[in-house]
Amino acid sequence: TKNFLPHMVEQGQGHIVNVASVGASFGVPGVASYCATKFAMLGFSEGLKHELSGTGVDVTVVSPIMVDTPLFDHPSFENFSKRSTIAILSPEKVANTILKAANSSKLEIVVPSVARAGIWAKHNFPFFINPIIGNAFRKQLTKRTSKK
């Protein structure tokens, strides 16, 4: 962004697409640092979108729920995908969404779109959703640390 943005503004056109995660909306036990980086990317993208208003340069952040990458090999995610009821997205699906995002005026595109309901529920009913998320991941974290 630092290298290309001045040229985009000079030309009066361009689109920056950043990738975060649905984890930007949920602080999750055991992967707090991961969630923090995603919170940061979403905040950076939102601030930059406001700063660039009227320049012809836009910003969109793509937030996939879970992508089939080596990240799931990390101990923090041990057995998570096996017990998850949420479909894990292919990298190709996310890549296609990133390409489409370059033509979108939205700040954030959540993939799959049904995950937006979880984000909405978390923001509107945190007293209900936060304990569910916390307990589910805490159980996983306890299992992992008790194996050591």
Which role does the model predict for each range below?
Residues 1, 37:
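Active-site helix of classical SDR
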Residues 21:
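Residue(s) in the substrate-gating loop at a strand-loop-helix junction
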Residues 54-113:
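SDR active-site lid
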Residues 28-32:
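Active-site loop immediately N-terminal to the catalytic Tyr-X3-Lys motif
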Residues 3-12:
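A short helix-coil junction within the Rossmann-fold of NAD(P)-dependent oxidoreductases
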Residues 6, 50-53:
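Alpha-helical segment proximal to the catalytic Tyr-Lys
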Residues 24-26:
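Conserved catalytic-site region of short-chain dehydrogenase/reductase
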Residues 39-46, 50, 57, 96:
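Conserved active-site helix of classical SDR/Rossmann-fold NAD(P)-dependent CH-OH oxidoreductases
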